[in-house]
């Protein structure tokens, strides 16, 4: 834990930490959505292979399914949320650093 010179610096640091944690949480959810898409695609390929159909047919069928669209939409949503939270955290870290340097001057 860093040493703080004033309460504003500490508040900025704590806000940055909280935003960073939310960003990581969103990233984990995005990874779960991507894994759901991948596992669904593989399952569809196995099912089609068992029936003697091609992987291309399985991919076409999978891409049209609601579960695939939801997984892709969830991935995109959570990735954008993670990006937003990480950018906000970076701004708060910069603010804390600025406040620290301003106190030293």
Regions found by a protein language model. Give the residues of each.
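Arg/Lys-rich, low-complexity, intrinsically disordered basic segments
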Residues: 2, 42, 48, 72-73
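Extended alpha-helical coiled-coil "stalk/arm" regions
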Residues: 29-64
